[in-house]
């Protein structure tokens, strides 16, 4: 279901973006793949969307446990590998099947650049 869930998230994003339901319009979006030059390991971000002022990095997790800080830390690290204009702000969104740990929820409440979406 992992790849199917990623497609569901992409479809939900596209619908909200087209309907003007997001804080800003994102004319470009797609999956990102690359190589970390330090580890020489392949890396992937499920969805990256760009607007005039923001790059939005999104991760979709279909797992039977709450998502924790480690997923955010990985997403933030991977976002540094994506070439983006310096003037753009970075925002992050995580979509999860089973919700989030209390630590990640508490952090998201303090960070306007982080959005969490749960399907439970």
Predicted regions, residues:
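A cross-kingdom feature that marks ATP-driven nucleic-acid transaction machinery
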Residues: 1-120
């Amino acid at each position: 279901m992992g790849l199917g869930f990623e497609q569901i998230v992409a479809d939900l994003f596209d619908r909200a973006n087209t309907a003007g339901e997001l804080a800003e319009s994102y004319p470009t979006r797609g999956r990102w793949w690359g190589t970390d030059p330090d580890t020489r390991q392949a890396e992937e971000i499920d969805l990256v969307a760009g607007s005039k002022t923001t790059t939005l990095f999104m991760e979709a997790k279909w797992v039977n446990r709450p998502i924790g800080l480690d997923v955010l830390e990985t997403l933030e690290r991977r976002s540094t590998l994506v070439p983006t204009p310096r003037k753009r702000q970075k925002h992050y969104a995580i979509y999860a099947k089973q919700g989030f740990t209390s630590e990640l929820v508490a952090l998201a409440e303090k960070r306007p650049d982080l959005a969490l979406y749960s399907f439970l």
